[in-house]
Amino acid sequence: IRIWGEFTEDPMATLAQLISDLGCETGKVGIEFSYLPTSDFQKLHALLPKADFIAADKIFDDLRQIKTPEETELLHRLSRISDTAIGASFDAVTPGMTEMDIASALTRSVYEQGAQDFKLMIVATGPRSELPNVGPTNRILEEGDICRVEIFSVINGYHAGVCRTASVGDPPKKASEIWANLVE
């Protein structure tokens, strides 16, 4: 493991030095081109002009699918955090609240349970519940509104998300019919 000082050192120079230290400066070097910005690759290529850079995106993607037991447990924990946070936010829902109130309860619960961050928070209610990937607004919740909430909890760069749907009070007839068809 090599560490570079963020904002004070060039990570590509550190990587080039590591590759050289391993004796690979004239060999094949697998690069995740779909992730590495072009400007960074150009720096790396200039620092290692004799290296044969090859696309290794598929290899990295395949390796990410393999999880250690510790990684699997962390993903389970993150899923539980996300699920519990959504449950806590739904428990707090009452007519007259706003979507922002739901978001506040959601994020508070995520952090209280030990997550370091969250990603892709969706809070959509009423007519907005049909829209994809929308964040919370100051829309006021009404009796019978459908609430769609999704959040990804994050620890050490690992993400796990959960999406749930509920209603404010009793659901409208159409929502109950859709639910009945889904569980049939």
Please place each PLM-identified region on the residue numbering.
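Active-site neighborhoods and metal-handling regions in enzymes and metal-associated proteins
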Residues: 1-184
